Design a protein with these regions (language model features):
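Structural signature of WD-repeat beta-propellers
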Residues: 128-129, 159, 175-176, 216-217, ...
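Extracytoplasmic beta-rich repeat domains
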Residues: 99-118, 146-165, 191-209, 231-253, ...
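Blade/loop signatures of beta-propeller domains
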Residues: 42-56, 63-99
Length: 291
């Protein structure tokens, strides 16, 4: 026999639904009051209170950190402007505006950094990783000349960019390989090239109008005559335990050539004959080899 069940009234169902909703609200309210994180015992410090806003020291700003007056520079013969790499405080007409751009052919910037360009006689001299020197007009960016200064297919040492140095008469360049080349900065023609036994690394740095100094991958320092490329003197290199892929770009100041090895060793040699003034070279304190 089938039994009939009496259905709850509408009011009863409504009251039941209200109770369920109320229960859910209570559960959420209790959850909101609960502690959400585990607190460890011990003292606490307010780290945000130690934050400081960068402020400019007014007195130091007025002093300009000893830079002196800004000077207008029309030539850029070395990294750092001068052979001592102490170009000083250069004047700029801000904001800077792009006048032109050009591409150096066959660069391999993923393999080697590029050398810093040099600017003399209204020209920009730039060096690509393919050992090609490109000459651009400073005002228009037009290519005026190109010169191959070494074997484009020769191997490169990662991080060795080669280098450029120039004055009103000559540009000296090497591409991180074995050749050192002089180019007439007026006619853009090669004057001379000399080949070293090891790849060159730092420099070139001009010694006035008389010479040029570079370093090689073994940390030796070499000085050449500027007019014909003849080797004047060569050091025996910084200590082997301080050298990693050569030395930095030499600095020439007050008759002294100063070189810093990548390993941290610093040496100073007399410009005239390479005589050691400061530091140590191959563990010796004698004079450099001269020719």
């Amino acid at each position: 026999m089938m039994k009939l069940h009496k259905l709850p009234s509408v009011s009863h169902r409504l009251a039941s639904a209200v109770r369920r909703v109320g229960l859910i609200i209570c559960l959420f309210a209790l959850a909101g009051c609960a502690d959400k994180e585990v607190r460890l015992s011990g003292d606490r410090e307010d780290v945000l209170s130690d934050l400081r806003t960068l402020m400019i020291d007014g007195q130091a700003s007025v002093e300009l950190a000893g830079l002196g007056n800004a000077v207008v520079n029309s030539a850029f013969g070395h990294p750092g402007v001068t052979s001592a790499h102490d170009g000083g405080h250069l004047s700029l007409d801000l904001p800077l505006k792009q006048l032109w751009k050009a591409r150096i052919e066959e660069t391999e910037s993923d393999v080697v950094m590029l050398a810093q360009p040099a600017i003399v006689n209204g020209k920009v001299f730039a060096l690509g990783s393919d050992a090609l020197v490109s000459v651009f007009d400073l005002e228009t960016g037009k290519v005026l000349a190109t010169e191959q200064i070494d074997d484009a297919q020769a191997g490169l040492f990662p991080g060795v960019a080669g280098g450029l140095a120039a004055n009103e008469k000559v540009l000296i360049a090497h591409a991180g390989r074995k050749m050192l080349t002089a180019i007439d900065s007026n006619s853009n023609q090669i004057l001379w090239s000399v080949e070293h036994s090891e790849p060159l690394a730092g420099g070139p740095t001009l010694i006035g109008n008389e010479g040029v100094v570079v370093t090689d991958i073994d940390g030796s320092t070499l000085a050449f005559r500027l007019n014909d490329g003849a080797l004047v003197w060569q050091t025996t290199g910084l200590p082997a335990d301080t050298i990693v892929l050569g030395s930095g770009s030499p600095t020439v100041h007050n008759g002294t050539v100063i070189v810093a090895g990548i390993g941290g060793e610093v040496s100073a040699n007399a410009v005239a004959d390479g005589k050691l003034i400061l530091g140590r070279q191959s563990g010796k304190t004698g004079t450099a080899h001269t020719t």
